[in-house]
Amino acid sequence: MPKKLLILGGTREAYELAECLVSQFSPEQLTVISSLAGVTEHPRQPAGEVRIGGFSDTTGTGGKSGLQNYLLQEKISLLVNATHPYAAQISENALAAATELQIPFLRKTRPPWVKLPEDHWIEVPDMEAAANYLIDYKTISQNELYKHSVFLTIGNRGLSIFRKCNKNRFIVRTVDPPKEAYSWSEAIFLEGRGPFTLENE
C-alpha cells in the first residue's frame, strides 16, 4: 500500500510541490492528493489526484472535524498546508486536526516581502483594519486620497470588506469575476490567472 499525502493547495507553491512529488515517486510508493477550495470556476489541475471543495462529512460538519474525518477515512500519512498566507481558518484547522490525530504536518510558507529603505508601507493587522484605514485616511486628507485608486489582489472572499470604502476607486485582480463585479460601480475588475510576467504586472 502506498503512503498517502494530502496537500491543501491552490497556490503556485502547492502546484510545484505536487508536480515534484509525482515525478519523484511512483504510484506504488506515494499517492499525492491535492485539495482545492473550489473558489475558482476552472482551476488548473495539479499533478496527482485532486479533490475540490470543503471537508464536510455525512452530517454536514465541516471545519476541523470534517478535515479529521477525511484524514482518517483516506488514511492520510502526511498533511501539507500549502495554502495562501491569508487562508487563516484552514491553516488553523489543519494544524489542529493533524496535531490531535498525530499525523505528521508540514506548513509550506513563502518568504515575506522585505521592506527596503525607500519603500513606504502602511502596515495593518488584517483586511478589516486596511478598509478602516482607507475610510479614516480619506476623512483626514480628502484632497489627497479622494477617488484615488486602490489596487486589491486579495482574492474574492475579502472583497466585501472594502465595499464600505465608497470614496475610493478600486482596481481588483481576480481569477474569476466575483458577484461584486456586477454591483460595485467604484471597482474595475481585471481577470487573469498567474503567474504573471513582468509585462503583465
Regions found by a protein language model. Give the residues of each.
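Glycine/small-residue-rich loop that forms an oxyanion/phosphate-binding "nest" at active or ligand-binding sites
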Residues: 64, 68-133
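Histidine/lysine/aspartate-rich catalytic loop segments that bind and position anionic ligands
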Residues: 162-193
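Structural motif
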Residues: 4, 77-78, 149
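Glycine-rich, highly charged phosphate/nucleotide-binding loops
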Residues: 48-71, 190-201
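N-terminal beta-loop-helix "entrance" segment that forms/cooperates
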Residues: 32-58, 180-187
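Hydrophobic, well-structured mid-protein blocks that either form specific transmembrane helices
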Residues: 103-170
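N-terminal basic/disordered segments at the start of proteins
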Residues: 3-39
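Short, polar loop motifs at secondary-structure junctions
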Residues: 34-42, 108-114, 155-158, 174-180
